[in-house]
UniProtKB/Swiss-Prot annotation:
Belongs to the SprT family. The keyword Disulfide bond does not apply. It is found in: Cytoplasm. InterPro entries: SprT-like_domain, SprT_Zn_ribbon, Uncharacterised_SprT. Gene3D superfamilies: Metalloproteases ('zincins'), catalytic domain. PANTHER family: PROTEIN SPRT. GO terms for cellular component: cytoplasm. It comes from Enterobacter sp. (strain 638). One of its GO terms (molecular function) is zinc ion binding. This is Protein SprT. Its cofactor is Zn(2+).
């Protein structure tokens, strides 16, 4: 899949949000944390990821083009919060109480762990699996782990193992 060209205005909106939220956090925390590097190379169904050691935020350009305002309002602060928590508290649970506090009390953004974006444009081949209550779509990676006997997956609703259809 070809990566879309991101409009300059969108990149500027992302950078403006990042800088505003970082300044807000630095003021509230009494710190001077540096600006993280922004990279538009996240792939797959993740909207973004925070890379702690390299202090960078990777954003999915395909999902960003399709959900521009949500990226600015939610995804950028979400990933920034991970980096700030790591700088402020060290290594803690990814979406634990420190992250929730950073999102809500410091950045002023609702703490949601996952996005609700439409994924059709970024979804790769999936394999149908079934439990007792519904059908599931496993990614190629998960399907191959099942085939090799390296993993089994269970339904989060009924708890039953998933079986290939």
């Amino acid at each position: 899949m070809k990566t879309p060209r991101l409009p300059i205005a969108l990149q500027q909106a992302v950078m403006r949000c990042l800088r505003e939220k970082l300044a807000q956090a630095n003021l509230k925390l009494g710190r001077n944390y540096p600006e993280p590097k922004l990279v538009y190379q996240q792939r797959g169904t993740s909207a973004g990821t925070a890379w702690l050691e390299s202090y960078e935020i990777r954003l999915n350009p395909v999902l960003m083009m399709e959900n521009q305002q949500a990226f600015v309002d939610e995804v950028v602060p979400h990933e920034l919060a991970h980096l700030l928590v790591w700088k402020h508290f060290g290594r803690v649970a990814p979406h634990g109480k420190e992250w929730k506090w950073m999102m809500e009390a410091v950045l002023g953004v609702p703490a949601r762990r996952t996005h609700q974006f439409e994924l059709e444009s970024v979804r790769r081949n999936t394999f149908p699996y079934r439990c007792q209550c519904q059908q599931h779509q496993l990614t190629v990676r998960r399907h191959n782990r099942v085939v090799r006997g390296e993993a089994t997956y269970r339904c989060v609703k009924c708890g039953e193992p998933l079986v290939a259809e």
